[in-house]
């Protein structure tokens, strides 16, 4: 059955093409497995909450915009009645207007939020022609393009400094709904959402120990497809593949009886007991979306994003306004990305690019382009492998915070620097293969990583290193490492903590002032200037890099399951998410490799200028 929604419709209609519904929400009460809801051009100010599930990946419920028609779903309302007072404007709104959720009494707070915590900001926002003003915590701070809110006599009062703009004459909007497309209940499976612009959601701070609503998301379900959408101006999170509330909600802030780490560890086991498994949760597809201007994340998720595929998304301007800050901000921030494949995304101008935290077992980060990110491109934290990072270009000044063991870094360009550290005071879980079942917990000892066929550029700066020489002094085989461990006699975890795990490093190219691991047998080590740049102009991204004469003679190390040492802790092979052997034999553009290293097969000695991405 096909249902239609149009601004000319009526919710008492049948939903046919000639007699469409007025709201998408009405269609959610009618559409069942196998049905399609076609939404026609216009602006829909509602939170769409699907009621029914599809029966399978082949019998899903599809919500889509009509071909060639622009459909916008907004979590905001246009607000008139602003009154000018001494250079600023004020509007008073009865709190009943907001219903059950008032973004101007709901603060941005939760576990791992670090600032501001003296005067909290709010999940609401004020927009002028789709451009968000900045919230300030005190009325005295109302400079141009800022706003402030307070409660008076059962009313929400908003003060704003619009400069020379009259908010009653143009389009001035405020957030009023938490989400744009998000089920109220969990377990609404096999939904497709395609072709919408969605904006202005009053989403809350979403750490891994809390309920994690986004502007759009499946809300702890299975098999969603979110594709071909434009998603922007979510106060915190754009797309959420996150956990739900029953397994904990900001316990560190709300109770404080234990560390956030301990609560997060408990969340893992609570999730398993609550039914977190491949058969029920995850396996989502997020593709070909444009996501920008969100305060915390473009894509976020703890547990709920496992077994998913995230690809061909363009993500930018995430967390870059820095109105608030905490340790959960990134273009993509996932915990427990088990068997999740993140590939062919373009991520730039974010505070942090991609952050995979805890349990990224079986994950693959492939063929992504990072540049102009504020702090760094990639953070891999307290996870034990196997984790494959291949065919990526990391082109910001700071590339990578390395707090991972059991990973393979293959055919990448690292154009900047790396920060490296171990974590011996936190043990995090690892799992049985391709499963959420917990197999054990371990500290992050450092080492046990593999680097083959990469190109390193840049020079050391601010305590961060260019190249792989921060591994100098590490052993180069498991046999050697274990011999060192057992020289300490019989013991337990203490003797393993005294030694650094082995690293497997070969066939890399080092340019500028980048330096190799001192036991790397085959490499190119030259101080030749790389002149590397990644630039975007007119919707096209080009890579430019100068490579030395020796580059054409360095043959790549063959990357497949049998040539990669198993991670020591989890003792599992590098393989595809379906359990088949993995082999890296194509570049980031999908071309077969031709005896070259790096992410692009046609790289050669001399100056290279390569088109690596073009907007559709």
Task: State where each predicted segment sits.
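Extracellular polysaccharide-degrading/modifying enzymes targeting complex plant/algal/animal polysaccharides
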Residues: 4-220, 230-232, 240, 246-276, ...
